[in-house]
Amino acid sequence: MGGLIQKPITLVGDGIENPWNAQTMLHAATMFNSPCRFRDRCGLSQSWMETVSADYPLPLISREELARDYAPIVAFDNLDEAESVYGFQLSRGPQPAVVVGNERRGLAKDIPLIAHHAVQIPMFSRRLNSLNVAAASAVALYYLSRGGGGKLQIRSQPNKRRPEILLMGAAHHVELGSSIRSAGAFGWGRLFVEDRQGVWFGCDRATIAEGRAAARRARNPIHVIPTMRDRRYAFAEACIITLKPIGAPLHQADLAQGPPQVIIIPDETAVELEREDWGRFARDVRFVHLSVPAQEFVYHYRLIATITLAEVARQVGQQARPGLIRPKRHEPLYDRALKLLSEKQGETVFLEELENY
């Protein structure tokens, strides 16, 4: 993957409704030393003042200011003929900007009219075709600021390259729920959760209601399996994702070795890497470094997890000739010889329940 581009990319939220999403977008921009602005079409400024901060007004921008002062402009949404963010090379210009849209409706129709590029994150789920807007913003900034990185792999049997995912120690149920949503959107049919903080399994009814508010409108499940700190496993390799400058960079690590490999994403606000017995997961353990430009920023688990999942999904790849042959959705690959966990454990979560994360 190439080095960082010289000019920071301004992140613009178009019609964002949820002020907490807006706050997380501001934090995502800070990770990449990027400014962040909002085009307020849905009363965001008022809800921001009422819920997040009455002392720190939301930085706003109009469509006219965006068109006048920024170039190139990237419309970042699932638009017709949008290019993949994987391998995308941003054209030169005085002040680049990437615009992400409303949580439910996406970009307003007048944004693509002033955009120089249309770019999207390839989704691998048949039903859930979007990420949390703040998580998508982090993925956009990660790849665009690094010149796009490698292209999406095209394989005859990509699911044979899909590793297991373990989300470890998330401190907040919304951050964890958004990460599970990302895993489902990127094509995982199951994942493991080490719920040390009790934010997902067995939490109080209010937390469950907040985290899983959307109705079950369809059947598009992901199986969430609990793991425990005292369990030992028999993976061939465990890759631990960290912001610390140790191990191979994320874009250089081989993260598509199939089910014998587990990608562990710890919440580094709650998990001390140095005190963990990583050998309980696999005979081979290596750290993988997710590098971001900023030295100080507000940590959000969903941002780290989604960037990681996006890169793993890129390496796993898509079915050959996806535009002509619809990929067959394989069932999750279980290594029965290892007897990791009983299929009866855990819970099935329908991805439509995660749309509000």
Whereabouts are the PLM-identified features?
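Post-transcriptional modification and biogenesis factors for structured RNAs
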Residues: M1-Y357
